[in-house]
Amino acid sequence: MEEDERGKLFVGGLSWETTQENLSRYFCRFGDIIDCVVMKNNESGRSRGFGFVTFADPTNVNHVLQNGPHTLDGRTIDPKPCNPRTLQKPKKGGGYKVFLGGLPSNVTETDLRTFFNRYGKVTEVVIMYDQEKKKSRGFGFLSFEEESSVEHVTNERYINLNGKQVEIKKAEPRDGSGGQNSNNSTVGGAYGKLGNECSHWGPHHAPINMMQGQNGQMGGPPLNMPIGAPNMMPGYQGWGTSPQQQQYGYGNSGPGSYQGWGAPPGPQGPPPQWSNYAGPQQTQGYGGYDMYNSTSTGAPSGPSGGGSWNSWNMPPNSAGPTGAPGAGAGTATDMYSRAQAWATGGPSTTGPVGGMPRTGPGNSASKSGSEYDYGGYGSGYDYDYSNYVKQEGASNYGAGPRSAYGNDSSTQPPYATSQAV
């Protein structure tokens, strides 16, 4: 480590109102300061929620760490030594961190620290905030000094805090999930500089978005997965849908809550009317195919043939070579522009050649919505936060723009321990 870095201290969890002068005034009590900076967003000029303090005497860093917790401008701040080991790699197994979901809007970091001290020594508390609305987004993270404390608190799963039920899950970084993350971002420290919203911490049992591409976008249909299975990942924006339909969790209950590859938007269903953990099941498959209502006969006869394969305003797929629906054996183009041979007459149990397997009651390809583990909340986290609050017209949890925790001003506290100045 360079000599001028030995006395540098990273300070995270700063209030939006904390200035460089306030930060320097607070830490000067621990020793002479030779440099102090609050990191700001280049575009908006607003604080990013973290900064750096450099002491003339490096021993003052330990003095600060031994005299916590520290509170500045009404927030519990998080000072850490600024060195490569602490800033680049978290402890294996998640750093004894837990996720807290469904937090009351009036709970503070001090309240959480006081409450969870009964389970063991708390080393860090972070509540996610919406910078625009200046209020809690209803979830956060808490770190313990001992792993046994994490096991103890997660065994309860739910606790009652300020009259509201709060969910507790063990949090682990995505880089410990077998390298399945398709985003080219790295986890840096407890709150590293990331390419996605917040950090790559999520519940240890939740899978990575099955259809996630670069930068959190949907990357295409997963391999070896039947297309058109009902109740699968409802609410996600597909290929050809409008941004208004993009959701993270349960979608609208009407047809068209997600679209297929290149399919035009269907009719929009009613807005969600639920909170907590329940969501309506859906019976449509990808691309607007109504698999439960499909018949087992051969080629559909026109747009309404069979009443099934094209029920949600998709272009007819059943035209033969001459353009006449059901005009006998020939070829047609499916939703992927692949030529298909249509069979005439006689029952068919699989639909058109190259088509989707039949689903419905009694078929193994059909599952209920509750059997799927929805990996919501953008691509940074592996769980669905939209179930913690009642939505009103928008479904992304917290109603704030998606951003990288520590790289944008839309979340609180957006600081990144992997960036040294």
UniProtKB/Swiss-Prot annotation:
Indicate whether Signal appears among the record's keywords: no
Show the segment(s) annotated as Disordered.
Answer: 171-191, 240-373, 392-421
User: Pro residues: which segments have biased composition?
Assistant: 264-273
Q: Which GO terms describe its cellular component?
A: cytoplasm; nucleoplasm; nucleus; P granule; protein-containing complex; ribonucleoprotein complex
Sorted keywords for this record are: Cytoplasm, Nucleus, Phosphoprotein, Repeat, Ribonucleoprotein, RNA-binding
Quaternary form?
Interacts with sqd; the interaction is RNA-dependent and may be specific for sqd isoform A/sqdA. Interacts with otu; the interaction is RNA-independent.
Which residues are recorded with the post-translational modification Phosphoserine?
A: 177, 366, 368, 370, 379
Q: Provide the phenotype resulting from gene inactivation.
A: Lethal due to developmental defects.
Record Pfam families: RRM_1
Residues annotated as carrying Phosphotyrosine in the record are 372
Task: Please provide, alphabetically and separated by semicolons, the GO molecular function terms listed in this UniProt record.
Answer: mRNA 3'-UTR binding; mRNA 5'-UTR binding; mRNA binding; poly(G) binding; single-stranded DNA binding; translation repressor activity
**Where's it mainly located?**
nucleus
- Positions of the RRM domain: 7-88, 96-173
Q: Where is the composition biased (Polar residues)?
A: 240-250, 275-284, 406-421
Which organism is this entry from?
Drosophila melanogaster (Fruit fly)
Return the protein name.
Heterogeneous nuclear ribonucleoprotein 27C
Q: Function of this protein?
A: This protein is a component of ribonucleosomes. Could be needed to organize a concentration gradient of a dorsalizing morphogen (Dm) originating in the germinal vesicle. Interacts with grk mRNA (via 3' UTR) and involved in its localization to the dorsal anterior region of the oocyte during dorsal-ventral axis determination; may function as a ribonuclear protein complex together with sqd and otu. Required for polytene chromosome dispersal in nurse cells during oogenesis. May be involved in the regulation of splicing.
Bias class Low complexity marks the residues at 293-302
| Highest taxon, organism lineage | Eukaryota
Question: Is the keyword Cytoplasm assigned to this protein?
Answer: yes
